[in-house]
Amino acid sequence: VDWTIRRWPENLGRRCKLELGVVGEVRATLEALLPKLTEKRNSAFLQASLAHYREARQGLDDLARGTPGRKPIHPQYLAKVVSDLAAPDAIFTADVGTPTVWAARYLKMNGRRRLLGSFVHGSMANAMAHALGAQAANRARQVISLSGDGGFTMLMGDLITLTQENLPVKVVIFNNGVLGFVALEMKAAGFVDFGVDLNNPDFAAMARAMGVHSRRVEDPGELAGALEEILAHPGPAVLDVVTASQELSLPPNITAEQIKEFSLFVLRAIMSGRGDSVVDLVKTNLLPR
């Protein structure tokens, strides 16, 4: 039986399939449960879990691909390339929203790397602020901010702080032109997304105007080279990556209600003249990468 321990009962089963829910503090609950458990050497559950992980991992890795010339860049591929090229002891910070999803799924942690985020409070624009603090406290370590374009534009004045304090933070921007997680929540609730599109400037050009080394990438074939250049730069640097705006970050389990509401979104989008966005969504998520 899969046990799920949550401090707040309303969170039980919110994101994962629930078999047995327990309400309480994790430490106190485990301390109460452990004396009542007997050791088992049957590894059937472990092997089943490992098999499930390998299958899920393969599915995620299949999405993290980029073909030169095939635009736009998929955010999964960007996160994977960042993980592959980052230092073994890098400190990552992730904005609330889809950057947190891509960081959780594609950054390979090894016991030396750290991942910081606003995982409980859920405040936007946290990535650069966290990166500033992490770099100030660890000037010898590589610090990479995984910023969404929405979060970045909220506090992009922090770029001036990077230059003023000479903090060599590397800012990687997932520039998809939309508040992606909010748009996805609207679609999952059956609504045609509105008020979420962003008319972004060229962030790389803007960073250069502030005296920050920068690159802008739109082609998957140029991504690795550009990121290597950014990471090798001795000072602060910005990598503005144009990513797919219609990428779906699906939860581990999808309910029948979610399928119904998403189908309702598709119908409403077509009837309201937004059929082109539905076509783009299908192409982004179903065509070869």
Predicted regions, residues:
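Secondary-structure boundary motif
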Residues: 39, 84, 88, 136, ...
